[in-house]
Amino acid sequence: MILIDTTPLVALCDARASLHRVALRDLQALASERLGVCEAVLMEACFHLAADVQRQRLRAVLDQLNIAAVPRADDRGFWTEVLDWLSKYADHEPDWADGCLAVLSGRDTGLKV
């Protein structure tokens, strides 16, 4: 499964985005792959896609591409792992979604970002 990060997801949903065409091209290259998204990425995408029509497009993209919801553990262990990862890579200034993607893909080697 390929985990989708915020930038390509937003680009798929907003034709005005500078990376829209690149995202469409990359999506075609990944047509045979299973795609997934975590809650933190959806939260960031909704922040960037503030208009109702953009969020409707987000919902359509999730549905049409059958993008799986990648569950995250709601336990302190998961949060601690993410916080530890954020601390380890603090010089790169990662955000919570970056940490979630890193920890999820680290827990399951079948997941790629």
What role is predicted for each listed range?
Residues 10, 43-46, 66, 83:
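Amphipathic alpha-helical segments within well-ordered protein domains
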Residues 9, 42-43, 55, 76-79, ...:
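Alpha-helix N-cap/helix-start and coil->helix boundary motif
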Residues 6, 39, 96-99:
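Conserved glycosyltransferase catalytic-site signature
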Residues 71-113:
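Active-site neighborhoods of divalent-metal-dependent phosphate/nucleic-acid chemistry enzymes
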Residues 9, 26, 48-49, 85, ...:
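Short alpha-helical scaffold segments that flank and stabilize functional sites
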Residues 31-32, 64-74:
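Short, mixed-charge aromatic SLiMs
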